[in-house]
Amino acid sequence: MQTRIEVGILGATGMVGQHFIKFLQGHPWFDLTWLGASDRSAGKKYGDAMTWHLGVVPETVAGLTVSECKPGNAPRLVFSAMDASVATEIERAFAQAGHIVVSNSRNHRMESDVPLLVPEINPDHLKLIPGQQRARGWKGQIITNPNCSTIVLTMALGPLKQFGITKIIATTLQAVSGAGYPGVASMDIVGNVVPFIGNEEEKMQQETQKILGDFRGSHIEPLAAKVSAHCNRVAVVDGHTVTVSVEFSAKPSEADLLHAIQSFRGVPQDRQLPSAPPNPVIYMHEANRPQPRKDAERERGMAAFVGRLRPCPVLDYKFVALGHNTIRGAAGAAVLNAELMHSEGMLD
């Protein structure tokens, strides 16, 4: 029987932390035994330290005592749901103390020695870790998952990289849950579209180039494609939709692209990792799909859905992509990253 691995969560009382807790319930490999939060929550029982927003708080964690977000009694593997305002120093302190930090926070994503991981797309980027440890003089490590909308975009584009992507134009329709809790004021979003999400467009553009880039022995060579993103907040609860136009150097046919999407599998599928969907990218042939309400929670929220593939009069082809922003776009992504690391022997 496989030895179970104790894990902790940094920022456990916030919305992202709660999604981590929910996703880890019943995990076949990981036991959630430690919860870290702010000083005002430390020392309290978890059930008394936060307001739970996802149904009923799991009994397995309600009685756990919340700790300060400091290395010491935390398990070696910690998931970070820290707010960006405090994540940088806390995550570094844990890595310096020998912890493996799998982070959902944005703070370290674009650092050259930190993997920005989508396990089906760029698992070889984990090879950055030895260089990270040497350069920073620590035995721990920091691994990040991308912005929630970037994950949807790169999962859809990953199978198509073989055709030589040269230009990408992406427009997002992003769910309100992506803004956290309490999120966007109802008077701002009901019956409305907000055509601005702070720093989101820059993150999508830069992160996409890094994720789809190639590992070159000691560094990542970013994808040499021009990427333009426009991000909008819409009155949808869960599920980010991205409309995408792409130009290719190889000039594939529509049939080539469709075959690449439908046949695509990655390392998580080959190794049957617990949180990996059997088909990471699912093509939907219906003219009006994918849709957040109908599709975002399929495959436990861990797949990306693509539809409406057709020629583009400006670039080469265009399509629609969809993914669950708080599952595959956040907690589920980080847990799958840790599963990949375990399958590589990096948690031993």
Model-derived regions: residue spans:
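N-terminal Rossmann-like NAD(P) cofactor-binding subdomain of oxidoreductases
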Residues: 1-196, 219-220, 226, 304-305, ...
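Charged docking surfaces used in two-component/phosphorelay signaling
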Residues: 177-348
